[in-house]
């Protein structure tokens, strides 16, 4: 594993990113993405139904804490336009009222724009970019993931919610029983510098 992967220094596919992010929605269980749910013959008889490959990789409490942090992205961060009507952009009136955890992303020189978003039973990701790294937007205003990828995710999710057969959740993420991590992003903390040298000056 390359440590710089967290900074976006390593190329990664949408499949890999969505698979990794969905681990948090799955309470710490990684489910390897699978494109085939089942194979049926012409009479509807199931010939093959691959079993999901799963692995416990993150503690449930940690996964829930990360989900709550990523909910902040859509409540008051770069993904907040999903909640309040598109941030003034025409034709992007999403106004989702349900909890959504997500993360926008923008690479060097605005070459890539990302948005990965999750609800309890669906994780989806959008990448806007070009294999030619020389192709990029001129400014972060236009090239950031919140401007390029997030609107596409919003349109996709509106269509998912419009299709009742998909049964995409609007419920809150499940809180683990016996949660041991206190998730509090609002109470200010007093920072004490233990390396400071005491003086008489105020």
Task: State the predicted function of each range.
Residues 1-6:
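Surface-exposed aromatic
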Residues 11-201:
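A penicillin-recognizing enzyme superfamily signal
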């Amino acid at each position: 594993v390359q440590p710089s992967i967290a900074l976006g220094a390593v190329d990664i596919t949408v499949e890999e990113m969505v698979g990794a992010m969905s681990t948090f929605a799955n309470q710490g269980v990684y489910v390897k993405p699978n494109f085939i749910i089942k194979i049926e013959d012409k009479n509807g008889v199931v010939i093959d139904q691959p079993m999901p490959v799963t692995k416990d990789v993150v503690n449930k409490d940690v996964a829930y804490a990360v989900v709550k942090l990523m909910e902040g992205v859509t409540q008051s961060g770069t993904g907040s336009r999903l909640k309040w009507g598109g941030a003034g952009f025409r034709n992007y009136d999403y106004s989702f009222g349900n909890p959504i955890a997500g993360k926008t992303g923008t690479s060097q020189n605005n070459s890539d724009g990302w948005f990965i978003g999750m609800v309890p039973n669906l994780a989806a990701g959008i990448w806007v970019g070009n294999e030619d790294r020389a192709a990029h937007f001129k400014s972060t205003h236009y090239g950031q993931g919140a401007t390029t990828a997030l609107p596409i995710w919003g349109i996709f999710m509106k269509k998912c919610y419009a299709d009742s057969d998909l049964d995409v959740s609007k419920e809150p993420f499940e809180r683990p029983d016996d949660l041991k991590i206190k998730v509090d992003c609002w109470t200010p903390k007093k920072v004490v510098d233990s390396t400071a040298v005491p003086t008489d000056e105020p």
